[in-house]
């Protein structure tokens, strides 16, 4: 199975072309913000929200081809704090309002997990 993780905004063309050309099933997971995310800037800023999701490490972009056993990491190293991305969405910021101490711990854990995930993907791409 060909697998790719992309967003509506970034690198989707390459992922979809590879998926279409692959002989067999393909899975393309695409980040697409919706109104239920509670984007504080409003739905008119969805393009920026997708960019921030990638820049913060919340959503890493990659492609994997089973035919070549090649894993391609399309994301660059995160350039913004995950917390800065998460506080821009009501689905996350509401936790901070309701349970500030828990939120602080959970946001720190999420930041650590996002960094570890990116490093894991980076190592995998470099080991090719």
Task: Please report, for each region that a protein language model flagged, where it lies by residue.
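Thiamine diphosphate
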Residues: 3-6, 104-128
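General beta-strand structural signal in soluble alpha/beta enzymes
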Residues: 2-4, 29-30
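Glycine/aspartate-rich loop-and-adjacent alpha/beta segment that forms the canonical ThDP
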Residues: 14-102, 109, 121-124
